[in-house]
Each structure stands twice: as C-alpha cells, then as structure tokens.
Amino acid sequence: MKIYNTMTRKKEELVPLVPGEISMYVCGPTVYNFIHIGNARPLVVFDTLRRYLEYKGYKVRFISNFTDIDDKLIRRANEEHTTVPELADKYIKEYKTDAEGLCAEPATCNPRATEHIPQIIKLVETLIEKGHAYPVANGDVYFSVRSFPGYGKLSGQSIDDLESGARIEPGDLKRDPLDFALWKGAKPGEPAWDCPWGKGRPGWHIECSAMSMELLGPTFDIHAGGQDLIFPHHENEIAQSEAATGKPFARYWMHNGYINVDNQKMSKSLGNFRLVRDIAQEFDLEAVRLFLLSAQYRNPINFTRELIEQANTALTRIRTARERLAEAKEGPATAEDESFIASLAEHEKRFCDAMDDDLNTADALGAMFDYARAVNTFVTEPRSKEALERAAKLFDDMTNVLGILQHSKSEEFPKEAVALLNERAEARKAKNWARADQIREELKAMGFAVEDSKEGAKLKRL
C-alpha cells in the first residue's frame, strides 16, 4: 500500500516499524460542542484506513485523543454554568453517539489530556533540561522554536517566512515571537495542576505529544488529522517531541482536505456549520459516510443536500444488491457459477488496487458499485451454494472495509414499525384491504417499504 506522506510530499510504500503491526495516532476533537461535518471527515477517513489495514491482516493500534482542557472548554463551561470536566464528559458522550452513527469503530484507546498531566509535566521538564524550553515569571513555559533546527519541515515554512508575520502579544513574556506555550500559568477560576514552575495547565500542542508517545512510543507509524492541523499543531508536535527524544516522531503524516458547504468555506461567520447531529435528523449517517468517501481524502469536498441525497440513493442500491444476494435461490452448480466465482478475484483486485493507491475510496466505491451490478445480474437465476457464499463474502469484505451496511447488521426495525407490520397482517387476514393499504402508506412515511411474499410480509428500508 502506498500513502501520501505530507512530510516528504510524495506517495510512499507503507512499511511499518514492526512487521504485521501498525501504530496510528489521529488528532481527535476538542470536546466543547457537538461535532460538525468537517470533524466527521477525518473520523470517517482514518477509520476506513484502519479497517482496510486490518482487512490486509495488520494488527492496528489506533489512538485518537480527546482534548478536554483548553481555552474553548473553559469559555463554554462558563457560558453553560458548568464545570470543565462535566462539559467534557457531556460532549465526549455526544461524540461517541455521532461516531457510532457514522459507523466508526471504537479506537484502541481515547486518551484524555487531563488523564496524562504527569506525562505532560515530565515532557516539559525534559525540554527545559535540554535547553529547548524556558519558564517565565507568570508561570508560563515556552518552547524555543529556534532551538530546533528542523522547525518548518512538515509545513514547508521557513523561520524567515514565519518571522515576518510574528509578533509578541501584550502580556506575553516569551523571548521570541515564534515561541509557543507548552504550559500556561494558572489564572483565577481556571482548572490548574501543580508543577515544578507553579500551578497551571498544559498547552494544546504538548498534550498530543505526551499522549502519543506514552501510548505508542517515541516513534510510531502514522500520525493523521485534518489539513488545518499541519501548521501550527503538527509542526509544533514534531518540534517538541523530537527535541525531547532525539528520535524521529511519526514516520508517515496523513492529512484530509477541507469540507465546503454549498461551495463556501464552512465558518461561524457565514453560519453554515452543519452539525452531524442535525444531519442525522434528515439522512441516514451511513449515507453521509458514503458521501465522505466519495472523493479522494486529500481533495476538498463540497457538502450539499443534493450530493447527500445522491449518496443515499447509492447506499440503497448497494443495500438492495446485498439483500437480493441473501435471498437468492440455491440451485445446482453450472458453468456460469464457475465463471462468476472466477471473476471474484478481479473484482477484489480492482477494489484493493484503489485502496492501495493512497486510500482512493472514490475508485474503491466505483469497484463496489460495479460488483453490486454484477451480483444483481447473477442472482436472477438459482445459483450454487458455493457461488452464493463466496459472492457474499466478497460483498461483506468490501462493505466492512468501507464501513457501510453496518447498521443493518445490528439494528432492529423500530418497535412502532414492527407493530404496524403485524397490524397490517391482521388487517389482510380480515380482508380489511383499506386499512392494510393505509398502514403501507404510514410505513412509507416512516421510511420503510413492505415486501409481500409467500413467506409473509417484511420491512425494507427505503
């Protein structure tokens, strides 16, 4: 598999540190609000990468953090008249609900910054001892950017370029405009922890360095996140981590592109933020996941209602093909069955070739749709048990990697819909055709179709 490495600006063969294992860290959310569609993209993209690596046989250690102490959390907690820990707990729970809706598998570990304060303090102490950081009178500790010769290597920015736009804000005690805070001295009414240079709390960048190295070691395979994190967050992570350990930090850097809404950049000023929670009121989040995978992950993607509706239609086509495959009648083996079995390897190869090419989910979806069409044609006649089983395995492998058709595996139909279906059966038994037709329309309004067969009626999602 080749992936585009932001550090080297080229596609590289993915060769893990430990054969057969992948260590991976994805920057998670600052938990002060519900997540929006922009937050959902890295969640879905890197969950898909993890799924594909596991499909290829790798053991993946997947870490994604929660930033649960930050200026934004403090402000929001004050607005909601609650504490920072209570606010963080609330939105971590909401995040997990949205992640489940988007079919993202739970991470191996979701570390919280506040659970790693001792490791953060130790890392800051190491940087001070090595001359890469310095405390100031108000309890802040700053990283000395010029002390790290490789600063700017991820973002491609030189010290000279950065220097021209840098300035020291009033009240800052840092020695150089380029320096950034590792630790912030305590302020009244803010959470604070004891440390050798006085009470305070960690800066954002040091949190991810401490947590990733604690859980994955000083050097690990993949560090990922949104494009907006390249500078300054990931650049600062590299500087402080490599300055502390003297070792390379992450070996591969992956970044997903931005999301626009109706061809405009998503921003608070435009009021066009789209919360996943709100989108879920109108659309199946599996369709949203499919939409997010419909473009190459490094490219920008445009969120529109029309495109989500198209993704919903596409998801229905895939779901229908899988249902037809499950319901296909068995028959004696034929030459056509053997021919179809032989074609499975080519379908799988096309899918994997796309995924191996820097996680090209757009082309992988194309391979999935072509396979679904082939399945639809194949199951119009009775087929051998072996052919049907092998066809189903490949279908499920593809959908499992993409993280679609996951809800149907675990989700039961709503009790209200099942009750209406049973009532309709009674109405038909009593030859009350008007009521039976009325119930069909009620179910349709709820998003379900009724399919009648010799075995009885069953529900199907529209």
Regions found by a protein language model. Name each.
Residues 1-32, 47, 97, 118-326:
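Alpha-helical recognition segments enriched in aromatics with Gly/Pro capping
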Residues 8-13, 17-105, 455-459:
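N-terminal, positively charged nucleic-acid-binding surface of large information/translation enzymes
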Residues 58, 132, 448:
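Short phosphate-binding/catalytic loops that engage adenosine nucleotides
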Residues 66-70, 92-95, 105-120, 138-146:
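Short, glycine/charge-rich beta-strand/loop segments that flank catalytic centers
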Residues 265-266, 272-462:
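Structural preference for alpha-helix termini/caps and helix-kink/transition segments
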